[in-house]
């Protein structure tokens, strides 16, 4: 009887998590080090040897995404080593692309944003992994 109660409780907890949206959080591979961009949808997740990758999608501009991660990661001790913007954001070009490389200790985080013309949604690629330096 106890095993039935345990199984039922486990199923109920899983159902509650799905309903409440906790399955839409960043994958465990990011170990709470990188947050999901607010209201962004997780599109793809991969585990890599020594790291992980997540692809997100949002209706916000790439500039807004970049500023969020710059501020958020700086508050948690990461420093920016590389920041590149491939077209000025003020041109309001829908194909703007931006890239950030941040480091903390022996880990590196690369963030790439891109807004394709056909979808209008900004794609966010996050790569987190160990560094060799």
Model-identified regions with their sequence ranges:
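An acidic-aromatic pocket/loop used at catalytic or ligand-binding sites
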Residues: 22-133
């Amino acid at each position: 009887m106890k095993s039935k109660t345990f199984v039922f409780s486990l199923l109920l907890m899983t159902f509650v998590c799905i309903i409440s949206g906790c399955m839409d959080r960043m994958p465990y591979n990011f170990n709470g080090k990188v947050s999901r961009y607010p209201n962004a949808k997780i599109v793809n997740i991969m585990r890599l040897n020594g790291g992980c990758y997540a692809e997100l999608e949002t209706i916000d501009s790439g500039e807004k995404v970049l500023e969020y991660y710059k501020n958020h990661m700086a508050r948690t001790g990461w420093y920016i080593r590389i920041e590149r913007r491939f077209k000025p954001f003020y041109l309001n070009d829908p194909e703007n692309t931006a890239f950030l490389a941040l480091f903390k200790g022996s880990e590196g985080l690369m963030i790439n944003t891109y807004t394709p013309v056909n979808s209008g949604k900004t794609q966010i690629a996050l790569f987190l992994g160990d560094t060799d330096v």
